[in-house]
Amino acid sequence: MSTLMVQGTTSDAGKSTLVTALCRWLTRQGVKVVPFKPQNMALNSAVTADGGEIGRAQAVQAQACYLEPHTDMNPVLLKPNSDTGAQVIIHGRAVTTMNAVAYHGYKEIAMQAVLESHRRLGESYPVIVVEGAGSPAEINLRANDIANMGFAEAVDCPVLLIADINRGGVFAHLVGTLELLSLSEQARVKGFIINRFRGDIALLQPGLDWLEARTGKPVVGVLPYVMDLHLEAEDGLDQRQTDKVEHVLNVVVPVLPRISNHTDFDPLRLHPQVNLQFIGPGKAIPPADLIILPGSKSVRSDLNYLRNNGWDTAIARHLRYGGKLMGICGGLQMLGEQVHDPLGLEGAAGSSAGFGLLAMSTVLEAEKQLRNVRGRLTLEDAEVSGYEIHAGVTTGPALEQAAVQLDDGRCDGAQSADGQVLGTYLHGLFESPAACSALLRWAGLANVQSVDYHALRERDIERLADLVEKHLDGPLLRELCGLEAN
């Protein structure tokens, strides 16, 4: 078994994308490869085949390998629920919530889980491609590190260092990061990859020559800036839009402090007939056909945030004028009458009034519901698939008019009697073409174009592998993976 790790000089340097690209590039060559990220901090997550929870980036990387996501691919997931605290998920299961200081002392236990998962993957896959987190040169985080060089040292693997030239200062990023590492860690870095380059490569060549002479390490390649690449963001909210046709549906999503699984909206962002707007703090909700309340890792505090921004008043006005309102997961809970958190799972224990638009209430319980599901929307009997990640148990008469009939016999969500309000626990439902089209028609869009989001994602994964093939040193990459040259 061989392990190759990708680390970055900064967050958003391109680590997730490069690991996805390498996984598909190796898979194309018949290599049995698996992705791995020791520790991830993100509110975007996916449900695995073994009934756990991992970061969505690792789920996409699994797709690049034609594998089902598994909890061993991301053994430690941290989901922030306050500015200083996070839910700690080990091997796909929430084990506790702790602040940053407490977690620092917990890292030795977390490292055991990381090494256990890495060992298990190594028993089934000859090549493991690992994604680091943030930067390996964060001085204050280096003690007991499990996400970057601490892991690389523990499993004795080579490292590639990637940097984003589009931000500027790429040579300072690479050299500075290298020099902040220990001598043994520096020796692990086997080469550099420069990401998001625009322009004439000949103008960059003197800098590449200097970098190799200065460090004694090769530049493995320079990846170009890709304008229309659309894969789920690991954590940051992706607000890029594609070109739209003349007649579009206006959809608004209020951005909440603890918004979770905002990748739910990627299919809408890419849809040619949808104008998707994310509205931040202090901004008024503009006229819209559909407002969607997103998932939340802290429903009661985000409800308070909505009200403090005056968005509750804007939503009421939107409904008076005939607009449609949808809630997903935490957004569904907000549509009800009460949200109760007796155990203090998402903050201080207590209860908060919801919007009272659906006759139901939610109690947050310690046991989280994690499922991949299929079913049919009550709208048009459209096929839908998605996943549940929630701690809430919702009850009330509103559920008698369900939004989804699931194949496992359960009903999900609710609709208002007047048809204006719809809520569901299902994340990812817009990725189902039939369900997406049905929901857009419900919101008022005529002549809806069907868009296959899964096909778009697959296309972009293939494009990434093409970039590796064209722009990176393939023989060196294979050598670092313990493979013979082609």
Swiss-Prot record:
GO molecular function, one term: ABC-type vitamin B12 transporter activity
Active site (UniProt): 329, 427
Domain GATase cobBQ-type: residue ranges: 248-435
One Pfam family, short name: CbiA
Biochemical pathway: Cofactor biosynthesis; adenosylcobalamin biosynthesis
Transmembrane segment boundaries: none
Gene3D superfamilies: 3.40.50.880, P-loop containing nucleotide triphosphate hydrolases
GO annotation, biological process: cobalamin biosynthetic process
Annotated keywords: Cobalamin biosynthesis, Glutamine amidotransferase
Function as written in the Swiss-Prot or TrEMBL entry: Catalyzes amidations at positions B, D, E, and G on adenosylcobyrinic A,C-diamide. NH(2) groups are provided by glutamine, and one molecule of ATP is hydrogenolyzed for each amidation.
Family: Belongs to the CobB/CobQ family. CobQ subfamily.
Protein name: Cobyric acid synthase
